[in-house]
Amino acid sequence: MSHSVKIYDTCIGCTQCVRACPTDVLEMIPWDGCKAKQIAPAPRTEDCVGCKRCESACPTDFLSVRVYLSNETTRSMGLAY
């Protein structure tokens, strides 16, 4: 099941999220849109298991990486509204 993974321009390019991901969803690429000149897009969101380890690993005050779980997953976890 695919989840939505969003990388924000507050990314500092530290690679912590990339290293924390157990399914290699993230990878670092050059990007001029942030201070670090690199960002971790999520080219393989279909492999995301929704563990949010990337979020936990992010050292920025405003999480630069966010995982939005699909409706089915949030419903099964009892988190749906």
From Swiss-Prot:
Residues that coordinate or bind [4Fe-4S] cluster 2: 21, 48, 51, 54
InterPro entries assigned: 4Fe4S_Fe-S-bd (IPR017896), 4Fe4S_Fe_S_CS (IPR017900), PSI_iron-sulfur_center (IPR050157), PSI_PsaC (IPR017491)
Cofactor: [4Fe-4S] cluster
Membrane topology, as annotated: Peripheral membrane protein
Domain (4Fe-4S ferredoxin-type): residue spans on this chain: 2-31, 39-68
Cofactor note: Binds 2 [4Fe-4S] clusters. Cluster 2 is most probably the spectroscopically characterized electron acceptor FA and cluster 1 is most probably FB.
Reactions mediated catalytically: reduced [plastocyanin] + hnu + oxidized [2Fe-2S]-[ferredoxin] = oxidized [plastocyanin] + reduced [2Fe-2S]-[ferredoxin]
Record-linked Gene3D superfamilies: 3.30.70.20
Compartments, record wording: Plastid, Chloroplast thylakoid membrane
UniProt superkingdom: Eukaryota
Subunit annotation: The eukaryotic PSI reaction center is composed of at least 11 subunits.
PANTHER family per the UniProt record, alphabetical: PHOTOSYSTEM I IRON-SULFUR CENTER, PHOTOSYSTEM I IRON-SULFUR CENTER-RELATED
Name of the protein in question: Photosystem I iron-sulfur center
Organism: Chloranthus spicatus
Gene: psaC
